[in-house]
Design a protein with these regions (language model features):
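A short, surface-exposed alpha-helical micro-motif characterized by mixed small hydrophobic
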Residues: 171-173
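A short, proline-enriched helix->beta-strand linker immediately N-terminal to the Walker B motif
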Residues: 123-127
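ABC ATPase NBD coupling module
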Residues: 29-46, 64, 72, 78, ...
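Conserved ABC transporter NBD signature motif
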Residues: 17-28
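Conserved ABC ATPase "signature" region
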Residues: 28, 80-99
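Short, glycine/charged-rich "phosphate-handling" switch motifs in NTP-dependent
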Residues: 177, 189
Length: 236
């Protein structure tokens, strides 16, 4: 879950208590020094969070936010950093990347903001990408586009990806292996197809059984009206 993932690179608040063991490429992460964790964050392990507006600075342009990471981790400055930022935006499917560099987060759609977050996560060539419910705040169409993008990046760049989600349909679609967690502990794990076809744990079995299947029964023409709405608007 997100708390476990955040504890991996020491991103929990100071009053959090971390127990157990997390090993990454032979390195013990729980209890590691801030210096060692800082070397891993962004370089080896990057995060994509559920709501990009909570991660992007509303006062800074997209260019500044991407280039800040490039400067901090790679020492890129000026035109070199700008060229790399444009490459990253093109890589994640942002149209008119050069023009978008000067945009601020509020000027982008939800899908575009999430693509910017993915670009920032990829900026320093991480080996592991931790995606925490990255499509929950998006509509179904944009959600599918982001999932396709992540799958494509995983295949082309050889990324390992830890995808945190409660959506079983997404698990089926994107995961090679699945871990089922209850109360912060893994109760079952294995190849996705095997776990879905033959769940073993008493928690996993009803969880998968609750997944909607088939099509709902058609509504009869004579069925009573349950709810109606007129002149309904949604705005942000």
């Amino acid at each position: 879950n997100p708390v476990t993932a955040l504890s991996t690179v020491g991103l929990l608040s100071d009053n959090a208590i971390g127990e157990g063991s997390v090993t990454y490429l032979g390195r013990q992460m729980i209890g590691a020094s801030e210096r060692d964790l800082r070397a891993v964050r962004g370089n080896d392990i990057s995060f994509i969070f559920q709501e990009p507006m909570t991660s992007l600075n509303p006062l800074h342009s997209i260019e500044r936010q991407i280039c800040e990471s490039l400067s901090l981790h790679q020492g890129l400055e000026g035109d070199n950093a700008r060229r790399r930022a444009i490459e990253l935006l093109n890589k994640v499917g942002i149209r008119n990347a050069i023009e978008r560099l000067t945009a601020y987060p509020h000027q982008l759609s939800g899908g575009q903001r999430q693509r910017v977050m993915i670009a920032m996560a990829l900026a320093n060539g991480p080996e592991l990408l931790i995606a925490d419910e990255p499509t929950t705040a998006l509509d179904v169409t944009v959600q599918a586009q982001i999932l396709d993008l992540l799958a494509d990046l995983k295949a082309k760049d050889g990324l390992s990806m830890l995808f945190i989600t409660h959506d079983l349909a997404i698990v089926r679609r994107i995961a090679d292996r699945v871990c089922v967690m209850k109360g912060g502990e893994i109760v079952e794990s294995g190849p996705t197809a095997e776990v879905f076809a033959n769940p073993q744990h008493p928690y996993t079995q009803p969880l998968l059984a609750a997944e909607p299947k088939g099509r709902p029964d058609p509504v009869a023409d004579t069925a009573p009206e349950v709810i109606s709405a007129e002149n309904l608007r949604v705005w942000f």
